[in-house]
Structure formats: structure tokens, C-alpha cells
Amino acid sequence: FLNVVIHRLPKMMERDWHCQCAELREEEAPVYEKLTLATPRSRCPACGHAISALENIPVLSWLFLRGKCSACKAAISPRYPLVEMLTGLLSALAALVFGCTWAGAGALLLTWALIALTFIDADTQLLPDSITLPLLWGGLLFNLFGTYTDLASAVIGAMAGYLALWSVYWGFKLATGKEGMGYGDFKLLAALGGWLGWQVLPITILLSS
């Protein structure tokens, strides 16, 4: 499912922007085939072949098909099984560490969101609000019960995470006239602060720089 999110969400956002621009210009909005995270069924980008359930088994289908579309034999990017393997390994690690608990459920949600954001950012340099903002509020909700840190540390972490990169952004822009990062980075660091508390922000900034 994360491969679907990584591939489709930026396309859905781009279509929304095109429609909004057309509306502002009082032009006719472009017409697109309906695209959501659920529909239509995944297809080969080369020939449009609809991928069956047997061809959509994580990792195994890619290996069985030898990395090629069953219809047109076009190469299927190895990144698809990479995302699937990474998701499986990190999900198993989260389950092993936290077990079948409230904290385990949160760790899985955080893991999946960060994987999706990492690959979307690598492809498009976008960090969608539709992931970062629910992630922020999700972290605060989990820490309402002190799941990963106390609520005060989570709230301070969210505020400090946003303001830290906001300050760097504006300092850099005033000094150079250029934008060094996007607002999505502010929201993502705020979300991480909301999940893990302000104490993790220095090491997070250091590792991501």
C-alpha cells in the first residue's frame, strides 16, 4: 500500500493544483481519470496492464516476474520491492520492541508515514500536508496518555521543531534571497517533536543535515 501512496499522492496533489489554477484564471478545469489511493487498480506504467492480486504480492511477485511486467515485459523498478522489504523489516522491528500495545500501534503508524514521506520527498521534494499534519496531531494524541513522552515535552517539541526550521528558513532567505527548504520540513520536524519530545530534536536535526 505504501508504494501506492508514494506513487499516487503527488499525482493527486498535482491534479488538485492544476484545477485550482484553472479556477483562479477562470478557465475550464482539466478533466482527469478518477484517481484515489483506492482506485483504479494498479497498472503497469508502460502498457497499462491491470495488475492482478497474484502479481501484487509484496516482494514475491516481483521476484516471480523477474522484475518485468507480465504483459509487455517492461522492467519494474526494484524500488517497489525495496519499499516493501523496508516496510516489512521496520514494522517487524516495531512490533518486536513494543509488542501488541498502544505504543506498538503508534510506532507502526509513525514508521509507515516516515517511509512514505522519505520516498515522496526523494521523488518530488514534497512533504504532503495530508501526511505531516495528521502525523503531528497523532503524536500529540498518543502522548496525551504519555505513550512515548509526557504531553508537555510533546507540545514543546512540536512548537520548537516548527520554529527551529522556520527561523533557519527566514534567516537564510533574508541573507541570500533564496529558499533553503520548504514548509513541509517545518511540519515534519514539528511532528517528530510531537511524537518523541523536544529532547530528540537536536540529534534529529544533526542527523538530517
Predicted segments with their positions:
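Membrane-water interface at transmembrane helix exits
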Residues: 2-7, 11, 74, 95-99, ...
